[in-house]
Every structure is written in structure tokens, then in C-alpha cells.
């Protein structure tokens, strides 16, 4: 009997509007009823409008067909397909060159996917470049380069975090390089540039430099400073003096002699090539060996050439930089990489700038860089979003030259679709209230982890005489449009052979809250319209954190009262006394869910313990958990939250 009922319960579906688990027939009836109500409302509205100006009657939204995302599609066609046609190399080499001055965010995940994916698809490699650069490969295709040219802002922890992020996403570096690997070579080329009379040492301050570039708004004539008239020997002497510590920070800098007077492109207005850092912090790798450091505009293009990067793929804010990139490479190096630019990924309703994130952290709005409400990669991971779900979202969006502005709702919907078929299901009660089944008998129930995928296996749960349901699933007074538990009303318990009927309840004399419900099995009644989740006695206590949008508006960075004025004071709700069934132990033991190459590290990572709490949401174990305490973060809700900004 129990097996038959369990099989029937496995076929229940979620009513998105009420959050109830119901039969397919019942859901069909509800949808039809809502459609009739919507049509009637539309007809009443239409009757009040002028003839010929009637809007179409509202119809229930059709359930979208499940899309199968081809991860290679964005490399075969569109922008990236065209990029390859421009330079169809047999051996493609790309790079991912972050500056190690902070933690990566969602936009960086797109850059990783683009560069590693492009090289992998074309059988090449990707390098990772850091302050230097690092060359990486997605499973041996890309280079990762660290652009480590600013020791004042760079820290060793950022290098480690960036490498960890790349591997978490499932990509393996073919090579890791650093801009600092090439410091001497770049210095020598800077001297060559001086000898070619294409660079000079300048002593102008910021105010004077701005005047040379046309003033604050660029409305005045541009001109080159007097230092550009210095001869080669003078410039070489000064540049070597910069190297040897003869100048104070910001008192001298090497400028490229480009075309400041005639070229309308600001990236050709005699950009800086070398500067003396203000704080003179020791470099992460080279210590105090160097007192001067190349700028991004000088180092980036040269390192691309040194490393044989065939396709230098970056975001559209570097479109104008392409001219200076090519100008410098043509002067100094033989191998010429090709730079092309694609649109950034922006998420509305949040911020990803380092300055904004620091403001939130310093004002204790969030717990740190890994707060689940942030869209840093650390925050996304702690929240429980799997690497595969993140990549699937990026592949779904594709790549164009336009900036991609995406709502939080769309992001969460993509994650929800990914999780639906890849994580097990458990029962969780946020606000438990006991139900004593007076005629109940204890028995073991075999519950599948997924009603749709038997490969996920099953677990045993003990049906006890006292069970706990969510307080929101009981009403003291019944109504016709209410289908959960109420006095004299019947409701199904997920995977339990018989529905229960509430016969009485008691209340706390002080608070007025429901203290206990008494019920009996309704063995002869009709099949219930609704099933609710429950947990037995002996279930595991848990703290559950439900996170909403961190900001009230879609553009928190532009809020009239500043960033902090736009913070949503209700962005986190904590349920301290939740209960989860003991099947959680098995889910934890078998993590990661789903299996992912980047999460098979041999170490336990709590956020890989992911599951769907039936009728509640998707959850992951938080890093605040201990052996004695379970802490859960909501990954995404089961249905779209209408109150969430889009």
C-alpha cells in the first residue's frame, strides 16, 4: 500500500501560485478556473473601452518547452564565429588576464567561459595571465595570465582565489604566466621606444595632464607637454633614474609619444607606459627589485605578443584601446595578436564594482566578500550555485558586441532549471508545529531522492506518530479556497499512505500561536487535493537563511541617496528552528550534487551539499555549519518571486 501511494505522490506537481503539491488533474482544473477568471476580468475591462481599441483577453502563460543548451553554440556562430573567420588559426591561443587586486565576480565568469571555451572549441589553449598574465586551458586549452603590474593593490590571496575560481568552473590552465615574468624584457623595450623617439619622461601632474587632453570635458585644443621635446639621452637618463629610485612617487612617468594633438581617440593621447607607485609596496613575486612598473596599456599587448596569443578577447570598454594596442605592438614586437571585443555581462539589481562591494562590507551590510547576497564568485559559490549552472546560464545568453543586461529573475530561473534535474529532494519544515496522529502507527517509508530519476537512489524515513508540518500549512478557520490543513479538513502528507484530518488544536496562552494539532488518518475519504511536506520526530535541527535581493532598485549604484540608501533591510530572513529529515546525512555523504569536475578536489566543501526542499526552495549547506549545527542557504526559490526586481 505504501509503495503504491508513494508512486502516486511522486507524480504530484507544484502549483506555482499557491506553493502546493497537487495532482495533475487538480492543477489542470485550477489553471482552467484561473483562466476563466482572467478572461472574465479582461472582458469586463474591454467593455469599458472604445470599440476597436480592445486588448486581447489575458491567457494563462503557456509552459515553455525545455531548452537544450548547446555549450558550443556561441563558438560556432555569431560574434565568436565571426572572430575565428577573421583569423582561422590552426593553433588558437587565448588568455584570461585578471588583475589580482580583488575577487572575481559574475562578469569574470563570462570572460573565463569565453576565453577558455573559444580555445577549447578550436583545439587550442588558453593562458591565464596575472599582473603579468596567466595562460589557462579548459581541460588543457587556455592560458591564464596574472596582470600583476600594480603592487600597491595586489595581494597573494587574490592570486590564489583567481586560480581556484578557474579550476572550480572546470577549466585547467595550460600554463600560468605573470606579467612580472617579463619585467626586464618590457623595461628593455621601453628603452627601445625612447631611442625610437616614441616615448619621453614627463613630470606633469594630473591637473596639467588633463589640460593637455582638452580639459575636463575635452572642449579645448589638445597639446603635447614641453617634456616631449627632451632628447633621447635626457629621456634615457631620467627613465633610468626612475628605475634606480631617484624620483619620488608620481613625480615622473614615462609617456608614449602617440598622437595627442590630431587623433580623436583618447587612447592615443600620449598614454603612460611606466609609473612609480605611490605606496611602494613590495611586489607579491619580485619583492623590492623594481621601483617602477609598466601600465596596463604598455604591458598587456606586449605580453599577449610574447605568449603567442592569437585571439585577445576582451570586453567592449577596450574598443578604443585596440588602436594603442596595435600601435605599440607594431613598433616593438614581431608577433601581432588580434584583439576583438564582446559585450559585458551586467546583472540588474546588484553591484559588482570593488569600491561598491567594499562599501557594503565596511558598513556591515554583508558578512564579507563571500556573502550569498553578493554576485562575487565567492558569494555565488557559498550560496550553492553549481559551476555547471553558472556556465549553462552564460552559454544560454551567448556572446554579442552589446552589453548584456540581465534581470535577477532570469538568472535565478536558469539556475532553477539546472538544479531541477540534478539535485535530490528532501523534506524541510521552516517553522515546525507538531501534529499528533492519534491513530498512527510507526513505519519505515522508502522515499526516492527524485521521482524522475531513479539513478539518484532512495532513502528511508521513519513515519512517527508525531510529525511536524509548517505552521503556514494550518489554519484555525477553514475556507473554500484553502486546500491545506484546517479543523475537519483533510490534507495529504507527501509519501504517506493515508491523508490526515485535523480534529483539534491547542494554542500557547501567552503568544496565541498554535502549540499542537491533533489529527487522525482519513482512510475512507477522497483523494486529497493537496499534499504538504512533513518531518518525523528525531529530525535534524537547522538554521535556514532565506536571501532576497540586496537592493530595492534595479540600479543601486545610481540611487539618489547613494548606494547604502538603496539597501533592502529585509534581504535576509533567518529561520532558527527549522527541521530537516535525516536523509540529509546521505545527501551530505554523497556530495557534490551534481557531480562536477571542479568540485572533485578531495576536500569537503559544504556548498556542494545541494538539494530541493520540497514545496520550499533549493538549498545548500553553508560554511558556518559545524558537526553540531546545520546552517542552510537558499540557492533559489522554487518559483519566480514576484516581489523581486527584474
Curated annotation (Swiss-Prot):
Biased composition (Low complexity): 38-61
Region (Disordered): 25-65
Matching SUPFAM superfamilies: Nucleotidylyl transferase, Ribosomal protein L25-like
The protein, known as: Glutamine--tRNA ligase protein virJ
Taxon lineage: Eukaryota, Fungi, Dikarya, Ascomycota, Pezizomycotina
Residues that bind L-glutamine: 147, 296
Any one of the GO BP annotations: glutaminyl-tRNA aminoacylation
Family that this chain belongs to: Belongs to the class-I aminoacyl-tRNA synthetase family.
Key words of the record: Aminoacyl-tRNA synthetase, ATP-binding, Ligase, Nucleotide-binding, Protein biosynthesis
